[in-house]
Amino acid sequence: MLTAEEKAAVTAFWGKVKVDEVGGEALGRLLVVYPWTQRFFEHFGDLSTADAVMHNAKVKEHGKRVLDAFSEGLKHLDDLKGAFAKLSELHCDKLHVDPENFRLLGNVLVVVLARHFGKEFTPELQADYQKVVTGVANALAHRYH
């Protein structure tokens, strides 16, 4: 999936990411851009407008939790299916999340990283991260297959 150089670039760059900020924004943008995903978060309170979603404390908190799991997964780039096995089981068997949502969130995460880091998030780094988020989405969807 990733070369040794790509893995090194991904993990080095990730050290600069403020997980709480980026996670909250990524999940918030997912809920705004793809509003049908909100059905999994109805218990989060007011999600009626983009502003409400982006300032919702529960969205920010869960976004941080999502990126904490992503951060842990980056330590296991050679075994993403193993790293995300329990989360795949939870999202498939208990939460019944459409696995397409994992791909959407990964793509939104790449957008948010580009927004936060500008030119520092080079096309090469974007390509590396696209591989990672695709791998994570596939790992999370593994239980569905």
UniProtKB/Swiss-Prot annotation:
<dbReference type="InterPro" id="IPR002337">
    <property type="entry name" value="Hemoglobin_b"/>
</dbReference>
<dbReference type="GO" id="GO:0004601">
    <property type="term" value="F:peroxidase activity"/>
</dbReference>
<dbReference type="GO" id="GO:0031721">
    <property type="term" value="F:hemoglobin alpha binding"/>
</dbReference>
<comment type="function">
    <text>Involved in oxygen transport from the lung to the various peripheral tissues.</text>
</comment>
<comment type="subunit">
    <text>Heterotetramer of two alpha chains and two beta chains.</text>
</comment>
<comment type="similarity">
    <text>Belongs to the globin family.</text>
</comment>
<keyword id="KW-0702">S-nitrosylation</keyword>
<feature type="binding site" description="distal binding residue">
    <location>
        <position position="62"/>
    </location>
    <ligand>
        <name>heme b</name>
    </ligand>
</feature>
<feature type="modified residue" description="N6-acetyllysine">
    <location>
        <position position="58"/>
    </location>
</feature>
<dbReference type="InterPro" id="IPR050056">
    <property type="entry name" value="Hemoglobin_oxygen_transport"/>
</dbReference>
<feature type="modified residue" description="S-nitrosocysteine">
    <location>
        <position position="92"/>
    </location>
</feature>
<feature type="modified residue" description="N6-acetyllysine">
    <location>
        <position position="81"/>
    </location>
</feature>
<dbReference type="InterPro" id="IPR009050">
    <property type="entry name" value="Globin-like_sf"/>
</dbReference>
<protein>
    <recommendedName>
        <fullName>Hemoglobin subunit beta</fullName>
    </recommendedName>
</protein>
<dbReference type="InterPro" id="IPR012292">
    <property type="entry name" value="Globin/Proto"/>
</dbReference>
<dbReference type="Pfam" id="PF00042">
    <property type="entry name" value="Globin"/>
</dbReference>
<keyword id="KW-0561">Oxygen transport</keyword>
<dbReference type="GO" id="GO:0005344">
    <property type="term" value="F:oxygen carrier activity"/>
</dbReference>
<dbReference type="GO" id="GO:0005833">
    <property type="term" value="C:hemoglobin complex"/>
</dbReference>
<feature type="domain" description="Globin">
    <location>
        <begin position="1"/>
        <end position="145"/>
    </location>
</feature>
<dbReference type="GO" id="GO:0072562">
    <property type="term" value="C:blood microparticle"/>
</dbReference>
<keyword id="KW-0597">Phosphoprotein</keyword>
<dbReference type="GO" id="GO:0031838">
    <property type="term" value="C:haptoglobin-hemoglobin complex"/>
</dbReference>
<dbReference type="InterPro" id="IPR000971">
    <property type="entry name" value="Globin"/>
</dbReference>
<feature type="modified residue" description="Phosphothreonine">
    <location>
        <position position="11"/>
    </location>
</feature>
<dbReference type="GO" id="GO:0043177">
    <property type="term" value="F:organic acid binding"/>
</dbReference>
<keyword id="KW-0813">Transport</keyword>
<dbReference type="GO" id="GO:0046872">
    <property type="term" value="F:metal ion binding"/>
</dbReference>
<dbReference type="GO" id="GO:0042744">
    <property type="term" value="P:hydrogen peroxide catabolic process"/>
</dbReference>
<feature type="binding site" description="proximal binding residue">
    <location>
        <position position="91"/>
    </location>
    <ligand>
        <name>heme b</name>
    </ligand>
</feature>
<keyword id="KW-0408">Iron</keyword>
<keyword id="KW-0007">Acetylation</keyword>
<keyword id="KW-0479">Metal-binding</keyword>
<dbReference type="GO" id="GO:0019825">
    <property type="term" value="F:oxygen binding"/>
</dbReference>
<dbReference type="GO" id="GO:0020037">
    <property type="term" value="F:heme binding"/>
</dbReference>
<dbReference type="GO" id="GO:0031720">
    <property type="term" value="F:haptoglobin binding"/>
</dbReference>
<keyword id="KW-0349">Heme</keyword>
